[in-house]
Amino acid sequence: MAYVKATAILPEKLISEIQKYVQGKTIYIPKPESSHQKWGACSGTRKLIDDRNASIKKAFKNGKTIHQLSDEYHLSIETIKKIVYSK
């Protein structure tokens, strides 16, 4: 996150309005909610985890036990249960 001087990007009228509420402080202006991305969307991590979870569900349906899956994927038994019993 880079700091930018308000005078460089905001109109003077808006700066005066903001100064009614705060002066000499750093203000963070977040992105609009509509432009937020879900966790892992940019890096591809979300897809990797979704693919892994699909493989775990498939293996469970094909007869592997929760303990076997826990050992194979190096996840806790509780995590495997959450994956296989989720919708």
Curated annotation (Swiss-Prot):
This is Uncharacterized protein YraL. Gene3D superfamilies: Homeodomain-like. The lineage of its organism: Bacteria, Bacillati, Bacillota, Bacilli, Bacillales. InterPro entries: c-mor_Regulatory_Protein, Homeodomain-like_sf, YraL-like. It comes from the Bacteria.
